[in-house]
């Protein structure tokens, strides 16, 4: 009412030319205003479509899945019907995936009970050969040997050196836990104690001689967790061929925000995933098309099936965030790949089980997304466009509210590629214009990144400031003169 009163009963649409994660357009829609979101980054564009554009198209519609047909008499408000279908078809996709790759995620026998338990994580460490000629141990690079620090349930790995080799046993309680073997400056050989400089580790990785070794398994004992050393069966099960259709896109090797820019010879995105992880993610992604056809068979329109596919593609993206070699094991759970706005090297990592009930599982990703969808406002139509903020996109008579990029604070385009490669696989046939490039567009991204200007901070600064000047000129064209423009710059 206050908005109507302040706008003469005719509130203008709210336009954000740097929509990003969609907060401003979403909250404008929640206030009952038409929202228009724009961004150059296709990942941001898809996030905004999923939050403000798609739900508004299918507002108050009942689901089409067979399980919900007995509830058709019920009132489906907002995006509840959409959420119901995402949950149903997400479960169907999981069942199809398990039929194909479930054997790659076997259970483990718990020694104390003889019962089988679901593995929720496999703990791995990267390894390089010790440079000491008298040693030559395949030395594990471990940040911490702790498995659990939970009071009364402490567990840790004890490395045992025998005949120049190392094996691991799981110990419980508050024993003397060995310090980790790797730091920012280098590592220490667990067998001979030799100090190993970081440059040697980088050179070994560049030469393709860095390996990975499974150290332990974490099992769901329901209740509680069980920890046990890796066995040959689980090691062999994890040793699968790389899938034929893995994502082959290159990583940016000029930015320190990515591990590819830190001298380890990591040059392509697929190198951030184990072969088992690649197999799972490509399988989930490929099955979206099958499920999309099932939506149509159950009575949904083609457009509606594409909407369901869009959300399932985001489930795959969320799955990828918990299914890479960038997932540390900390605090008794798997840490997401993007614990911060960078992709550093993670020495000892946790491989999740998408078919478990713990962190990194498919069901959890579905639940997270459907809970969010149920709470979306979706009562006003919205528009999302992919465009360059420095160019006039033709929007007029709007109220502009935006949170622009901050010089070189965050390289969103470089980081977004992690999610883009999976979204593109799943959605390029539905949104060909948004996924026309192999990677996220970067050259025109409005950030002051020196590496894009041969290392010149001054040129990067001038590019950013000139670009922001052009953006402000465009905003003057877009906005209704009787309303102020709000720009958040902290």
Which sequence ranges carry the predicted segments?
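A short glycine-rich, Lys/Arg-flanked "PGG" loop and its adjoining helix->strand segment in the class I
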Residues: 465-483
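Conserved SAM/SAH-binding loop
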Residues: 21
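Nucleic-acid modification enzymes, centered on SAM-dependent nucleic-acid methyltransferases
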Residues: 1-15, 25, 29-398, 405, ...
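Conserved redox-active cysteine motifs that mediate thiol-disulfide chemistry
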Residues: 18
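Nucleic-acid endo/exonuclease domains
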Residues: 458-463
């Amino acid at each position: 009412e206050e908005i109507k009163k302040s706008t003469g009963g005719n509130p203008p649409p709210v336009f954000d030319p740097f929509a990003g994660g969609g907060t401003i357009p979403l909250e404008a829609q929640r206030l009952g205003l038409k929202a228009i979101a724009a961004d150059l980054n296709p990942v941001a564009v898809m996030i905004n479509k999923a939050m403000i554009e798609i739900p508004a198209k299918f507002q108050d519609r009942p689901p089409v899945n067979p399980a919900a047909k007995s509830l058709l008499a019920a009132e489906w408000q907002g995006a509840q019907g959409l959420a119901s279908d995402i949950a149903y078809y997400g479960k169907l996709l999981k069942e199809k995936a398990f039929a194909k790759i479930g054997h790659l995620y076997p259970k483990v026998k718990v020694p104390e009970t003889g019962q089988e338990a679901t593995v929720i994580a496999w703990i791995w460490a990267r390894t390089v050969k010790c440079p000491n000629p008298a040693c030559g141990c395949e030395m594990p690079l471990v940040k911490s040997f702790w498995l659990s620090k939970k009071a009364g349930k402490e567990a840790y790995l004890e490395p045992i050196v025998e005949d120049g080799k190392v094996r691991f046993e799981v110990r419980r309680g508050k024993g003397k836990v060995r310090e980790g073997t790797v730091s920012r400056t280098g590592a220490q050989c667990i067998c001979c104690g030799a100090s190993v400089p970081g440059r040697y580790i980088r050179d070994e990785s560049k030469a393709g001689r860095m390996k990975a070794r499974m150290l332990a398994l974490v099992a769901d004992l329901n209740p509680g967790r069980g920890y046990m050393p890796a066995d040959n069966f689980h090691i062999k099960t994890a040793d699968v061929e790389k899938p034929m259709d893995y994502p082959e896109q290159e990583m940016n090797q000029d930015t320190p925000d990515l591990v590819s820019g830190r001298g380890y010879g990591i040059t392509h995105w697929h190198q951030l995933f184990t072969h088992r992880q690649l197999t799972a993610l490509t399988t989930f992604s490929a099955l979206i098309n099958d499920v999309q056809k099932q939506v149509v068979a159950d009575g949904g329109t083609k457009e509606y099936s594409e909407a369901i596919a869009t959300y399932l593609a985001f489930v795959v993206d969320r799955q990828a965030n918990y299914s890479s070699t960038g997932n540390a094991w900390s605090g008794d759970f798997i840490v997401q790949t993007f614990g911060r706005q960078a992709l550093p090297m993670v020495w000892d990592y946790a491989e999740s089980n998408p078919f478990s009930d713990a962190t990194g599982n498919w069901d959890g990703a579905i639940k997270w997304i459907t809970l969010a969808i149920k709470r979306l406002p979706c009562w006003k139509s919205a528009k999302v466009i992919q465009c360059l903020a420095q160019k006039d996109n033709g929007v007029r008579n709007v109220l502009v509210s935006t949170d622009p990029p901050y010089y070189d604070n965050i390289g969103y385009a470089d980081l977004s590629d992690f999610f883009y490669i999976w979204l593109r696989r799943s959605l390029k046939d539905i949104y060909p214009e948004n996924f026309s490039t192999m990677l996220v567009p970067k050259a025109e991204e409005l950030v002051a990144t020196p590496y894009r200007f041969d290392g010149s901070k001054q040129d990067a600064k001038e590019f950013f400031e000139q670009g922001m000047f052009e953006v402000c000129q465009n905003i003057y064209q877009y906005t209704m003169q009787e309303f102020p423009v709000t720009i958040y710059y902290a």
